[in-house]
Each structure stands twice: as C-alpha cells, then as structure tokens.
C-alpha cells in the first residue's frame, strides 16, 4: 500500500510540474456534459491547470464519463458573464482568441501559444457570440477542406490545444515547473486528497 501511495505522489508531482498556468480555454455556454467533459479531458492531457466557463443560464456545469475523471485535475472557474471572464483573464495577461468561421479569422496554427493564451469556444449550435467576438483580441479558425465547415466543439478544442502543446514542447515550456511555489504546494495538497 505504501508503494502505491508513493508512486501516486510521484505521478501527481510529475504531472503538476508540467502544468501550464498561462494556457487555458474559455467556454461560452458549452453546456452539453459530453462536450464539457471531453474538453476538460483534453485540457488535462495538454497540461491546462484551470479552464473557464460562462453559462448565461446560470446552471452549474455537469460532467459525464467522457471526462475520465479529468474534472478532478483541471479546475473549472465559472464566471457570471462574459465581461467578468474577460476582465479576469486580461488582468492576468492573457490574449484571448475566439474560434470563429469568419473571413478575417487567422489559421489557428499562426498563433503563438507560448505566450499567455486563452482560446474561446462557443455554444455547440451557435458558436461564439458577437459580444464575445467583440471582446476577443482576435479570431482563429481551423481550415476546412470538405463540405462540412465546422467541427464538434470538443474536437475543435482538441485540435487547437494540441497545437498549443506542440509549440510549448518545442519551446521547452514543459521542461521546468511553471507554477509559483506557493500555488504548486496548494494544488499538490488538493490533488493528494483526491
């Protein structure tokens, strides 16, 4: 039993050393549990520490088995509205890119994800709202070559977040701890209780 406990602690410390506090997602009214769960699972896979959500209906997000338990390892901060979410991210130095099917949107691979970055994803059916687009620093898109012009929101999140991971790996951002020591200890204590 002691070996399992020590192995678990080592694994938690290894994962925590790679967490990227300056890479996140902002989810605008993404309310389907399977999409939210899949996005959080991808966030965990690429090292996102905290995701953000705005749900205008005020409901508390729910998860399903798609998360693989990742909602325990990626914090989800729910904001009361878009302005509060943007204020929170901007005060922390994030550039916010909204995903959008627009002519003026940049190819998602042209963005430098090694800088503090939040990627905004919109509701499953409608995408990012005009209000959110107006607040964002820029719009990005995943080029589509087929007849279908959009991907499921959780698939789009995976595509973009793994590009961010690729860039960050190349820049060596996973090679050293990114959390300040106080936050590291706080999160470590929380994770060890789970």
UniProtKB/Swiss-Prot annotation:
It catalyses: guanosine(18) in tRNA + S-adenosyl-L-methionine = 2'-O-methylguanosine(18) in tRNA + S-adenosyl-L-homocysteine + H(+). S-adenosyl-L-methionine binds at residues 99, 122-126, 142, 151. Changing residue 151 to A: Small increase in Km for AdoMet. Changing residue 144 to A: 15-fold increase in Km for AdoMet. Changing residue 41 to A: Lack of activity. GO terms for biological process: tRNA guanine ribose methylation. The keyword tRNA-binding applies. The keyword RNA-binding applies. It is an enzyme of class 2 (transferase). Changing residue 124 to A: 2800-fold increase in Km for AdoMet. Changing residue 41 to K: 30-fold increase in Km for AdoMet. Changing residue 152 to A: 80-fold increase in Km for AdoMet. It holds the Pfam family SpoU_methylase. It comes from the Bacteria. Changing residue 128 to A: Small increase in Km for AdoMet. Its EC number is 2.1.1.34. Keywords: Methyltransferase, RNA-binding, S-adenosyl-L-methionine, Transferase, tRNA processing, tRNA-binding. Catalyzes the 2'-O methylation of guanosine at position 18 in tRNA. Type I methylase, which methylates all tRNAs. Both N- and C-terminal regions function in tRNA binding, but the substrate tRNA is determined by the catalytic domain. Binding of TrmH to tRNA is composed of at least three steps: the first is bi-molecular binding and the subsequent two are uni-molecular induced-fit processes. Homodimer. HAMAP family: tRNA_methyltr_TrmH. This is tRNA (guanosine(18)-2'-O)-methyltransferase. It comes from Thermus thermophilus (strain ATCC 27634 / DSM 579 / HB8). The lineage of its organism: Bacteria, Thermotogati, Deinococcota, Deinococci, Thermales. The gene is trmH.
